[in-house]
């Protein structure tokens, strides 16, 4: 089943990725029953072109919104500044709770969306599920 996101949210993720250059950008889309409700940009606590970590204060704010509005983490997004829109080994590792064996997904219901700016004029946006460390691409549909 395709991940359906408003075109404006896809454009906002691309804009965010460009604005945060030279570092990776990150954020979330919160929603209910698979329907996107709100995109929230986050600060990259790593401030790195090679890695992202959603700033803990931002993550806490997102969890509070999820609780207050009875939403879910629909999308966790980030950018790759010079590589393809595909989860890196670090991205896969970061999708899991540390030290769990077998692996436990940190956000089992979330889609992972990557924005590649490898070609600055033609950004690429792709969606994935990461389950137990296994990456599966999903169709992404702008609505």
Describe the residue ranges of each PLM region.
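Conserved, mostly hydrophobic/aromatic
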Residues: 76
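Metallo-beta-lactamase
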Residues: 79
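Conserved beta-strand-loop surface patch within small alpha/beta domains used
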Residues: 1-73, 82-143
């Amino acid at each position: 089943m395709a991940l359906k996101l408003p075109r404006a949210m896809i454009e906002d993720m691309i804009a965010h990725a460009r604005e945060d250059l030279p570092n990776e950008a990150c954020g979330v889309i919160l929603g209910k029953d698979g329907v996107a409700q709100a995109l929230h940009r986050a600060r990259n606590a790593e401030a790195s072109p090679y890695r992202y970590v959603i700033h803990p204060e931002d993550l806490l704010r997102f969890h509070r919104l999820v609780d207050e509005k009875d939403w879910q983490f629909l999308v966790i997004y980030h950018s790759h500044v010079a590589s393809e829109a595909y989860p890196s080994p670090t991205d896969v590792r970061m999708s899991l709770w540390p030290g769990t064996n077998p692996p436990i997904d940190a956000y089992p219901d979330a889609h992972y969306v990557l924005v590649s700016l490898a070609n600055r004029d033609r950004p690429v946006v792709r969606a994935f599920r990461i389950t137990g460390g296994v990456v599966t691409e999903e169709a992404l549909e702008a609505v």
